[in-house]
């Protein structure tokens, strides 16, 4: 598997998702005891990108898949297939969703060149932020809450934004001058 995620309602639905380097997406609805293909709507099944899941409502979720070929897909718990949101020309390499997605519907992507895009309506409309850090982005973390603070792990360190990605400040003080390849924020 190249990525594995559990449903935000796992205690009730026992659902787990996994992506593979050849077969696409699998879903288990019984704690991983058995798996079914979950690919309808995805063209290329070789998935080297990332999969994110966000809670919406008390029992629903939405999945966002950046397969690693430039495009971005979305699928909700009630949909029967994936919907392509952005084509390969977008160059999407990673996707991140707000931990407060049910309240603020914020999604952010980064391309292989470091170009950022943000959506504050559940990925229906996108705003291109360019490459404000002039670096390659390897990870995105959106802080919980209404402020939607954003942290980037980049080839030039850690960057921070408190204005939905319009501006970023380098926050790499006391970190070695090297590439940061992942970043996360506390859920609290």
Where are the regions a protein language model picked out?
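Extracellular glycan-interacting surfaces
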Residues: 1-188
